[in-house]
Every structure is written in C-alpha cells, then in structure tokens.
C-alpha cells in the first residue's frame, strides 16, 4: 500500500510539474509573439505614416510592390486604412488577452476592446476594398486568399463583440482568440517569408508573387492559426 501511495504521489507531482511547464511555455510563447508583433505594428505605423506625411507614398512600393498607384486613389485610401488599422491592432491585440488586465482593469479591457474590434473591421474593409478596386500583385490566387482573410477577420470581429454583448464569455473569449490569431497574420506572413529566404533562397517565389510558394502563402499565413 505504501508503495502504491508513493507511486500515486509521484504521478501527481509529475502531472503538476507538467501543467506548470505547459503554462509557463504557453505564457512565454504568447509574450514573444506579442512583443514581436507589437514592434512590427509600430514599424508599420512609423514606416507608412512617415511616407504619407512626407508626401512620398511611392515609398510604400519599396516594401510591397504595386501597393500605391497614383491613378487609383480609392485603392490607396483602402490600403492606407488597412495599414493604419492593422498597425494599431498588432499593438493592442495582446493586451486584450492578458488575464490580469481583464480581471483588475475591466474598463480598460472594455474600451480598448471596442477600439480593437473597430480597427479590426476597418483593416478588413480597407484590405477588401483595395482588392476589389485594384487586385493584389499576385493575381487570382492571392486575391482569393487575401479576400478570405479579410472576410474571416471581419466575421471574427463581429462574433467577438456579439458574444460580449450577450455575456457569453466563453464564446467571446474563443472568438477573441480567433481574431487575435488572424490579426497577427500579417506579422506571420513576413516571418514565414523571411524564414523561407534563409532556408531556400526564395525557392518557389517570384517578384510577381505568383510562384508555387507564394500561392501556398496566400492561405498559409492565417488558416493554420485557426486550427
């Protein structure tokens, strides 16, 4: 009996240690993702805002080709809204998921949450309007992939606020996580391409973003996040 009791105690201790390690690794991963995406969000705001205020919107094309076209101002407005809102949601996103803020500062959570939802919708609508007016550099496959991304982000934003209003907190939190997983997609898109460059020296990528790897990336930067 003593041996069995000791064995059961050891098993509980191992399970407890495993749970603690899981919680720590999950929190560490979230902290790394939030910090990195926070910095990337600030970069987006600084880079694209600086080009706007310096009246040098052609600089947008240095990062992503064919983003700015002086002959299509409506498309430029759409993508400008997408960049501005997208930068802010990367900065704000992780804050919405921190338990201590939700518990100790509910008003901060509620008001930043409202802003986060609004900006997510603006980012989605801005990107979708750009695709509808001008289309992406990568053609049909990229148009479909990025349009689906915008639609899913808009739906996730609506569902997040809908369940918050209904006080269905578990559903609200589930959709908030989905929205965050989508929001960091733009950051993951750059990270994935950077890693691919290091590993393969651009195998499957073209300057027109219509290579086989580009076609995969039109969906890969957000769909796995939702699984």
Annotated model-derived regions:
Residues 2-227:
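Alpha-helical membrane insertion/targeting regions
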């Amino acid at each position: 009996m003593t041996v069995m009791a000791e064995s059961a105690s050891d098993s509980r201790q191992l399970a407890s240690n495993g749970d603690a390690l899981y919680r720590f690794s999950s929190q560490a991963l979230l902290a790394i993702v939030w910090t990195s995406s926070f910095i990337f969000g600030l970069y987006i705001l600084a880079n694209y805002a600086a080009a706007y205020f310096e009246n040098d919107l052609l600089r947008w094309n240095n990062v992503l080709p064919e983003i700015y076209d002086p002959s299509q101002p409506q498309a430029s407005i759409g993508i400008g809204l997408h960049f501005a809102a997208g930068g802010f949601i990367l900065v704000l996103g992780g804050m919405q998921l921190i338990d201590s803020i939700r518990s100790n500062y509910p008003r901060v959570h509620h008001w930043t949450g409202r802003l986060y939802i609004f900006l997510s919708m603006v980012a989605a609508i801005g990107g979708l309007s750009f695709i509808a007016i001008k289309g992406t550099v990568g053609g049909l496959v990229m148009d479909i992939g990025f349009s689906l991304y915008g639609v899913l982000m808009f739906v996730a934003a609506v569902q997040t606020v809908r369940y918050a209003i209904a006080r269905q907190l578990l559903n609200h939190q589930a959709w908030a996580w989905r929205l965050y997983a989508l929001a960091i997609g733009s950051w993951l898109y750059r990270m994935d391409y950077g890693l691919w460059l290091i590993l393969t020296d651009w195998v499957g990528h073209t300057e027109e973003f219509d290579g086989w790897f580009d076609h995969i990336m039109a969906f890969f930067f957000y769909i796995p996040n939702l699984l």
